[in-house]
UniProtKB/Swiss-Prot annotation:
Subunit structure: Homohexameric ring arranged as a trimer of dimers.
Coiled coil: none
UniProt keyword list: Nucleotidyltransferase, RNA-binding, rRNA processing, Transferase, tRNA processing, tRNA-binding
Family, similarity comment: Belongs to the RNase PH family.
Binding site for phosphate: R90, G128, T129, R130
Identification of the protein by name: Ribonuclease PH
Gene, per the UniProt record: rph
């Protein structure tokens, strides 16, 4: 669709400005502020000696993740889920997605019987909070593992290739990369794609308001691959600073 335009002026295959700031807080072994445009997420990686009961005496480590949004992360304040006494299904789903995605980046055998806890707290939400969380948390994870290696805690080299994630949607028949909230809320098709190198870790896709065919899916995945390659470069640049 040649007359299609995005509210922020980006090309349809263009990412928002991505910033990754390491050492955002001082207590965790790894700490990052990741920004996808106006979406900002604090990602931390904390190390715990030992593993959950189901992993004991296995020789393997474990990685788990928690995701949450601060009350004022959105235009209208939302009460903390802990105060309501119940965590939403969406929060559980995203927490599990982050954990699955980052376990793809770690060799649990090489981690030894140690646990890495990933916490992703959304400071400001403008679409793509789960994809920003995964992308930023990988950098925090890399820093945490570097600390473990320096301390001689881990027996091997647990970190594998980088993992990054991006959203892609179809809006008015046009595939668009990295959706802010304004686009995400009206997308006909909405996908989150997690990649490691040129391989897919997970693909979440829904025809929110319309169906899609194989040709559209191919374009969506091409856009996602382009975005993830740019995110890999941003992660690498951040870790080299």
């Amino acid at each position: 669709m040649t007359d299609f335009s995005r509210a922020d002026g980006r090309a349809v295959d263009q990412m928002r400005t991505v910033k990754i700031t390491r050492g955002f807080t001082s207590n965790p072994a790894g700490s990052v502020l990741v920004e996808f445009g106006n979406t900002r997420v604090m990602c931390t990686a904390s190390v715990e000696l030992g593993v959950p009961r189901f992993k004991r005496d296995s020789g393997e480590g474990w990685l788990t993740a928690e995701y949450a949004m601060l009350p004022a992360a959105t235009a209208e304040r939302n009460a903390r889920e802990s105060m309501r006494g119940k965590v939403k299904g969406r929060t559980h789903e995203i927490s599990r997605l982050i954990g699955r995605s980052l376990r793809a980046a770690v060799d649990l055998d090489e981690l030894g019987e140690n646990t890495i806890n990933i916490d992703c707290d959304v400071l400001q939400a403008d679409g793509g909070t789960r994809t920003a969380s995964i992308t930023g948390a990988y950098v925090a994870l890399a820093d945490a593992i570097a600390v473990l290696k320096e301390q001689g805690v881990v027996p091997g080299n647990p970190l594998k290739a980088a993992v990054a994630a991006v959203s892609v949607g179809v809006i008015d028949g046009q595939v668009c990369l990295d959706l802010p909230y304004e686009e995400d809320s009206r997308a006909d098709v909405d996908m989150n794609v997690i990649m490691q190198g040129d391989r897919f870790v997970e693909i979440q896709g829904t025809g929110e308001h319309n169906t899609f065919d194989r040709d559209e899916l191919a374009v969506i995945l091409d856009f996602a691959q382009k975005g993830c390659q740019e995110l890999f470069a941003a992660q690498k640049a951040a870790l080299e600073q």
